[in-house]
Every structure is written in structure tokens, then in C-alpha cells.
A protein has these predicted regions:
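Nucleotide-sugar-dependent
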Residues: 226, 265-272, 277-299, 306-316
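Acceptor-binding helix/loop patch of EC 2.4 sugar-transfer enzymes
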Residues: 8, 13, 68-80, 99, ...
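Donor nucleotide-sugar binding/catalytic pocket of nucleotide-sugar-dependent glycosyltransferases
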Residues: 40, 129, 137, 152-204
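N-terminal subdomain of nucleotide-sugar transferases
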Residues: 1-62, 172, 230-238, 242, ...
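Conserved donor-binding/catalytic core segment of Leloir-type glycosyltransferases
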Residues: 207-226, 232-238
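Nucleotide-activated donor-binding/catalytic signature segment of Leloir-type glycosyltransferases, i.e.
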Residues: 213, 244-273
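A charged, aromatic-enriched C-terminal amphipathic alpha-helix characteristic of glycosyltransferases
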Residues: 329, 342-371
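Membrane-proximal helix-turn-helix segments that form the acceptor-binding/catalytic region
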Residues: 88-95, 112-115, 119-123, 132, ...
Length: 373
């Protein structure tokens, strides 16, 4: 079977980070004996810079770079224009090819590229899987400027209708968490967590772990979805706490026990996580995120997990007794959650990672589902 996978956002392994969802998915299709073309943007969403093109054939898959207009802000008209230009470029490149796919897997977002996937599926007689990685346009409503909040729902209604049209038109709909099942309106929705590679678990066996202390770490995007102010406030109020922050974006603190490392390559991030004790997931209370990428990194490192997310994330933390939850935006609640982690060893998170987040099993099962006759 010839498979096309389309996603403009995930980092590529050649950019220094760990393998992310769609690369891991592509490898699973290759393991099952399928031919894979991986379509992605030539502009890095996380780094906001032009990408260096990897080899056109990489690890057995073809990598096709789609020309994309740059943008600097995650919430901006320039980004919307960039997404539309990406969708047009992908349409043109796909139609110029001599080969035809049997299956197209398209991430959602973006809405415009997912819509192209539906159209290409009809034109090329291919089945189409829409894979929901984030809630669009619902996330836009949450991030709308305060003056626009009262009318954001009405302004975004056309995008919401288009998203629902895409979900109905797809042959299959999959996603990264159970929460998105209701969003799609599909009873046949298939959930596949983002996951993380199992070999990463063993990396930490050879590194020094934090010794039952109270050294916190946050890794990931430093955008508006995350509430680091509350974490810093809790650290300032308790001299036994330290915080390491690693990620892309702007961050500063006048507290000497708060350290900012910037964006770290995979090995340096692994080493930092191994030195810390507790991974923090400080999501705002109106977030649509089910389980963020950082939870997989923390679990693979054996960190105790403190999260303000409810739903699936809180349920898994409770099931494996590997951390605690706190009230979003409340520093005293976060401090209490940190204290509640005192008697928890790293094996609890590692067990959760082995049972729930093993990427090999997740994506082999995914391939089995979407290729069923």
C-alpha cells in the first residue's frame, strides 16, 4: 500500500529533537511493509525559521517539503495566510506527482490542509484518515483577545462548520486523546496517544536522578496556553523549590532558583530531566489539551508529575499514583501537590510509560486499525 502522511508542525529528527507523532507513525507503516511519503512544511513551526531539507529519502520513507510562508506569531493573520498557502502548495505538488496513494493520513490542524486531504482522496480514489492532534477552531476561541471573547464563537462558526464537514467526509477519524471523540461526532473514532519511543526509557538508567528532592522542571512551548507565572510564584514562596525551564519562546525570572535553558537538543533535555524530580504541566483551566507531549517526556524520565489538567491526564496520574493535580492558577494548590509527591518513586511513572505510552505498540496498533479492509 502507498501511504501519504501530511503534517506541517512536527519537528523532524534531523532538527535535534526526539521523533514525534507523524515520524513514528511513518516508521510503523514502513515496518508493516507499506510505502510512505511524509509531507511536511519547509518552515519550522516551533523554531519559526526555514528548515534545511533532509534527504528526499530518509530511513526508507520519502520526505516531501512543501513551500510555506513564514510567520512569527502563533496567533496571527500571517499564520492563517501561511496555512492557506501551505494547503495550496500541497495540492499543487500532490497533483503533479505520477504516483497515487491508497491511503492519506492528514493531521487536523490545519483545517485547510485537512480539507485538501478530503479533496485529494476523492480525486485520487484514496481512503482518508483525519488525525486530530488539537482542537481547532475551539483553541482559537480560548486564545482570542479579551475584547473579542464575547463574539469569538460567532466569528469562528464558519471554521467550526468546516471542521465538522471534514470529520463527516473522512473515511476514518483518529486522534491523540479520548476527549476529541465528542468533538468529532464519530462513534468509530480511534484514540492513539502521542507516545514516546521505548529505548528512551533505558537512557535514564545510566544517568543520575534527582534524589527525592523538590527540583521542578518544565519543558515545551512557552506560549499562552501554559501558566508558568503560577509555578514561579510557588517557587518564590518556598525556598526548598527550584525550577528549570527548557523550551522555545520568551521567559525570564528574577528568582535565582529559576533557571531558563532555552530550546535544548534531545540529549541535553534528557540529561536535564534526569537531574530533576518533578515535571510540571501548568495548563490553564480553559485548555482543550487532553495529554500534552511533555507528559510523555516526564513519564519516560521517571519524573513525578504535577498537573493542572483534569480529564485523561489527571486520570492516568491517579491510576498509576505517579503524581498529583492542582487547581489551575493557584500557587498554594501547586505547592500542596508538590508536597504530596514526596513519597512517590520514579518507578510509578516508568510503569505508566511502559503500559500506556510505548510508541512502537501505539503506532503498530494504529497502522493495523487504519489499514483494515
Amino acid at each position: 500500500m502507498t501511504v501519504w502522511i501530511q503534517n506541517p508542525f512536527d519537528s523532524l529528527p534531523s532538527e535535534g529533537g526526539r521523533k514525534q507523532r507523524y515520524w513514528l507513525m511513518a516508521e510503523a507503516f514502513l515496518r508493516a511493509g507499506h510505502r510512505v511519503t511524509y509531507w511536511t512544511s519547509d518552515f519550522s513551526h516551533s523554531g519559526k525559521r526555514r528548515r534545511e531539507a533532509p534527504p528526499s529519502v530518509h530511513d526508507g520513507m520519502e520526505v516531501a517539503m512543501v513551500p510555506t510562508a513564514p510567520y512569527s506569531g502563533n496567533v496571527s493573520m500571517r499564520r492563517i495566510a501561511s496555512h492557506r498557502a501551505y494547503a495550496r502548495s500541497w495540492t499543487r505538488m500532490a497533483c503533479e506527482r505520477g504516483d497515487r496513494p491508497d491511503l492519506i493520513v492528514s493531521s487536523m490542524p490545519t483545517i485547510s490542509a485537512a480539507s485538501v486531504a478530503i479533496s485529494l482522496g476523492r480525486r485520487l480514489s484514496a481512503r482518508v484518515v483525519i488525525d486530530v492532534q488539537d482542537a481547532w477552531p475551539e483553541t482559537f476561541e480560548r486564545l482570542a483577545p479579551n475584547p473579542l471573547r464575547p463574539i469569538a464563537g460567532a466569528l469562528l462558526a464558519p471554521l467550526r462548520r468546516e471542521a465538522q464537514r471534514i470529520y463527516r467526509a473522512a473515511d476514518m477519524v483518529t486522534g491523540v486523546c479520548d476527549r476529541y471523540r465528542d468533538l468529532t461526532g464519530r462513534d468509530d473514532y480511534f484514540r492513539a496517544y502521542l507516545g514516546i519511543e521505548a529505548p528512551r526509557h533505558r537512557f535514564f538508567e545510566d544517568l543520575r536522578y534527582g534524589t527525592g528532592g523538590r527540583r521542578l522542571v518544565y519543558s515545551g512551548n512557552l506560549g499562552r496556553s501554559y501558566d508558568l507565572d503560577t509555578v514561579v510564584k510557588a517557587v518564590k514562596a518556598d525556598e526548598s523549590l527550584e525550577l528549570d525551564v527548557a523550551g522555545f519562546g520568551e521567559f525570564s525570572s528574577d528568582c535565582p532558583r529559576v533557571r531558563f535553558h532555552g530550546m535544548l537538543p534531545a540529549e541535553r533535555l534528557q540529561a536535564l530531566l534526569a537531574e530533576c524530580d518533578i515535571g510540571v504541566i501548568p495548563m490553564r483551566d480553559d485548555s482543550w489539551v487532553g495529554i500534552p507531549n511533555k507528559m510523555f517526556d516526564y513519564a519516560a524520565a521517571g519524573l513525578r508529575i504535577v498537573t493542572s489538567l483534569g480529564g485523561e491526564a489527571a486520570g492516568l496520574v491517579a491510576k498509576y499514583r505517579c503524581g498529583a493535580t492542582y487547581r489551575p492558577g493557584v500557587a498554594t494548590s501547586l505547592a500542596a501537590a508538590v508536597s504530596a509527591c514526596g513519597g512517590i518513586g520514579r518507578d510509578a511513572s516508568l510503569e505508566m510509560c511502559r503500559r500506556e505510552f510505548d510508541a512502537i505498540k501505539i503506532y503498530d496498533d494504529y497502522v493495523g486499525f487504519v489499514t483494515m479492509p
